Amino acid sequence: MTRTVYVNGDYLPETEAKVSIFDRGFLMADGVYEVTSVLDGKLIDFDGHAIRLERSLGELDMRNPITKEDLLEVHRELVRVNEINEGLIYLQITRGSDGDRDFAFPDPETTTPTIVMFTQNKPGMADSPASQKGAKVISIEDIRWGRRDIKTVQLLYPSMGKMMA
């Protein structure tokens, strides 16, 4: 079964999903993300994720392209059409693209943010060995930048840390 994803207002088969190569999220990690767990087909702490999303967007002076109510509806629809009982929904909003690569932020009045959402099915997530017994972790200095409170898509260093563990 092909997974259904959400891109800029449209529900699409994942094989048809496209984002511009000039999108600032791709070129500059200029975006934020949230991951909402799904257990027993229910969203876990959606309100907390929506609040943090709004705060992160505000800290980056990014426009939110979707209302909280519509965001909840998209989450529920993705859970329904993808038949997710245990898993997650990944959401990413980027500043979008106004054409060529540039360090200056594009005009928010003329540039539409990009929003992408997809599900991951994780059957047995709550009963996994890591959930039951824990997982090996290490502590490493976070050298990303001084604004770790903003949940950006800059995840290379945490990925490297996971590989070190």
PLM region spans:
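Conserved alpha/beta cores of soluble small-molecule-handling proteins
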Residues: 1-165
